[in-house]
Swiss-Prot record:
GO BP term, example: proteolysis
Obligatory cofactor(s): Zn(2+)
Tissue: Midgut brush-border membrane.
Keywords (A to Z) from UniProt: Aminopeptidase, Hydrolase, Metalloprotease, Protease, Zinc
Family label: Belongs to the peptidase M1 family.
Cofactor: record remark: Binds 1 zinc ion per subunit.
Organism domain of life: Eukaryota
Protein name: Membrane alanyl aminopeptidase
Described purpose of this protein according to its UniProt entry: Binds to the B.thuringiensis toxin, CryIA(A).
EC class (word): hydrolase
GO molecular function, one term: aminopeptidase activity
């Protein structure tokens, strides 16, 4: 999924909410 490659600031909120480890790590 391309969204996983985007910075946390541009990634959709639902991705950040569903995957906090990606949000914090990226």
């Amino acid at each position: 999924d391309p969204a996983f490659r985007l910075p946390t600031t541009t990634r959709p909120r639902h991705y950040q909410a569903a995957i906090p480890d990606f949000s914090a790590g990226a």
